[in-house]
Curated annotation (Swiss-Prot):
Keywords: Cell membrane, Membrane, Transmembrane, Transmembrane helix. It is found in: Cell membrane. One of its GO terms (cellular component) is plasma membrane. This is Uncharacterized protein MPN_465. It is a multi-pass membrane protein. The chain crosses the membrane at residues 41-61, 72-92, 109-129, 145-165. The keyword Acetylation does not apply. It comes from Mycoplasma pneumoniae (strain ATCC 29342 / M129 / Subtype 1) (Mycoplasmoides pneumoniae). To M.pneumoniae MPN_037.
Length: 199
């Protein structure tokens, strides 16, 4: 069934986007204790401990859509200041530390444009995030295969677009998730490291 989703990547991405947005953003309080949707998708309650209501909804609602939002939405010169000011620096988020460090006009432009929007930084960050993600999925023991098929393939499809990985890498990693999940963390980290340092 997983390869059927891969054959139609766009519709699969839109489906996961709607599920994540409905699950994480519209019901953030239910996410704390593991909602009904998470139990149906075999997501363990231990993964539902972060209160996502304190984070910007526009960024959380697209956790796997880096290909569409990374360049056009977050990394645009005009939107960078608006994103930091309106979402991160909103009144329900504002504190002394946030206003002084993140919400300053100078820091917002430098941090968003130079750090997040640089291709090298994006790839380096994605390497550590992906390595932590797949190590976490592997540590789920009995639930690792089901949870990996649901979240891992979605992340691989987006990382495949973000890091310009070969098309066969998505099929390779997806197959390893279902048949040999213990080999996934090493191969993913090796492939992304090789692609990152070959800029």
């Amino acid at each position: 069934m997983a390869f059927l989703f891969i054959s139609n990547e766009w519709k699969y991405q839109q489906l996961i986007f709607k599920i994540n947005c409905w699950h994480f953003c519209y019901y953030p309080k239910n996410y704390l204790g593991g909602s009904i949707l998470s139990k149906r998708l075999f997501i363990p309650p231990s993964a539902c401990r972060i209160d996502l209501s304190v984070f910007p909804w526009a960024f959380i609602c697209s956790p796997w859509n880096f290909c569409s939002t990374w360049s056009s939405l977050i990394c645009s010169p005009c939107f960078s200041t608006v994103w930091v000011s309106l979402l991160i620096c909103s009144p329900w988020r504002s504190t002394t530390w946030t206003n002084w460090l993140i919400c300053s006009p100078c820091f917002s432009t430098v941090w968003v444009n130079l750090l997040i929007c640089s291709p090298w930084a994006a790839k380096v960050v994605s390497i550590f995030v992906s390595r932590w993600l797949f190590e976490f999925l592997y540590s789920l023991n009995s639930l690792r295969v089901t949870y990996s098929v649901f979240t891992g393939i979605t992340g691989l499809l987006s990382l495949n677009c973000l890091l310009n990985l070969p098309e066969n890498s998505t099929l390779l990693f997806s197959g390893l998730m279902m048949y040999q999940p213990e080999k996934v963390p090493f191969l993913v980290f090796f492939t992304m490291s090789w692609n990152s340092f070959s800029l």
